Amino acid sequence: MKLKIREGTISDDELCGAIMLGALVSADIPRSFLKDDVLILPLRSNLRFIAFYDQTPAGFCDYSVSKSHINYLFVDPLFQASGVGTFLLENVQRRLETPISVNVLCRNEKAILWYLKKDFTFTKLWSEQFNGQLTAWLKLTKKTF
């Protein structure tokens, strides 16, 4: 196994959307916001890392330096539990060097447990409209290493 990482660009929007879609399907997260089962994830003003497992795109992380916040961290289901998510998280932590936050859907128990295992702590719970329904979210925060 050889994990590599590179900076992502807007040319990776479709790739990241495909990885995110695969992970959402795997976690049985509603995807009513999709049109024709296609997701293009715009980079906007975020920074992005793309992880490769033996030269195959395996995951990505979009994050904000100014907010010290992970906007998205998704791993292709074929590569979950192989260290890709940890690899992405560690690279973001080294880049930010400040406490990091992430918002996770409460129904995504697998992701919540993963972040808690990585020493994130519960910061906030709230509900807001998402996909046309009231949805519960958790904010998790981690001090840097």
Regions found by a protein language model. Name each.
Residues 1-11, 140-145:
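Conserved N-terminal entry element of GNAT/NAT acetyltransferase domains
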Residues 7-78, 89-91, 95:
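Acetyl-CoA-dependent GNAT
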Residues 85, 89, 107-111, 128-134:
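Short glycine/proline-centered loop/turn elements that form peptide/ligand docking sites
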Residues 95-107:
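Conserved GNAT acetyl-CoA-binding A-motif
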Residues 116-125:
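Conserved acetyl-CoA-binding loop of GNAT-fold acetyltransferases
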Residues 46, 133-139:
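Short hydrophobic/aromatic beta-strand or adjacent loop that forms the aromatic wall/cage
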Residues 76-82, 106-107:
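Active-site acidic-Proline motif in GNAT/NAT acetyltransferases
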Residues 81-94, 113, 117:
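Conserved acetyl-CoA-binding loop-helix of GNAT-fold acetyltransferases
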